[in-house]
């Protein structure tokens, strides 16, 4: 090994070659190890899904007879889950966005999304849980985080991520935003252009 090292070091061409190969190989190694053991179970009747997943031990499951017409799944982190139930219909320009570790997005059986629905679970251990038979119209945002920290005068963070619970048979009208920590009861109807914070 020392002989090879001396040879490479004495020859400027070989030295540059090894140097540049290491620069290329290291990011490749990171990319390969950063995508270990991600599992996707797609049982959909029809699916058009764009997946951008970086991390390890992430799990995506799409239920039986679901129809997905234009969903982007973006994951950055590890041990995250996206579970779409059976008989769901997800329209075009929808996105599920996860950043952080141990986050979950669960869509119950027979849910329908019209189009442009954005579900965002961020930070650590937060989740979005939609019960069965929920109807989401267009331009809906549901999120578990503010996407940035806020600190008080004692430098303590005051806006941690919180789980969102939406019970079954909920209808969410257009242009509605559901913020972190919200619980919505069974059979509720959220009016157009609402911002739900509690």
Residue spans of the language-model regions?
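Flexible, glycine/small-residue-enriched loop-and-beta-strand segment within the central core
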Residues: 61-182
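Short, hydrophobic/aromatic alpha-helical segments in well-folded domains
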Residues: 174, 191-192
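Short, recurring structural edge motifs at helix starts
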Residues: 48-52, 71-74
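Terminal amphipathic alpha-helical/low-complexity segments used for targeting or macromolecular assembly
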Residues: 1-50, 56-59, 65, 133, ...
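Short, intrinsically disordered, charge-balanced linker/junction segments flanking boundaries
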Residues: 85, 194-198
């Amino acid at each position: 090994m020392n002989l090879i090292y001396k040879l490479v070091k004495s020859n400027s061409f070989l030295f540059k070659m090894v140097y540049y190969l290491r620069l290329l190989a290291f990011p490749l190694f990171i990319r390969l190890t950063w995508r270990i053991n991600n599992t996707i179970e797609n049982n959909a009747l029809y699916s058009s899904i764009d997946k951008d997943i970086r991390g390890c031990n992430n799990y995506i499951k799409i239920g039986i007879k679901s129809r997905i017409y234009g969903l982007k799944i973006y994951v950055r982190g590890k041990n995250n889950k996206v579970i779409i139930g059976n008989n769901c219909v997800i329209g075009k320009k929808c996105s599920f966005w996860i950043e952080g570790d141990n986050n979950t997005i669960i869509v119950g059986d027979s849910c329908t999304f019209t189009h442009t629905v954005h579900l965002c679970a961020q930070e650590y251990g937060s989740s979005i849980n939609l019960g069965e038979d929920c109807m989401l119209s267009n331009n809906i945002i549901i999120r578990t985080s503010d996407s940035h920290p806020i600190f008080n005068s004692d430098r303590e963070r005051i806006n941690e991520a919180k789980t969102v619970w939406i019970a079954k048979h909920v209808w969410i009208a257009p242009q509605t935003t559901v913020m972190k920590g919200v619980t919505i009861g069974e059979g509720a109807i959220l009016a157009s252009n609402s911002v739900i914070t509690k």
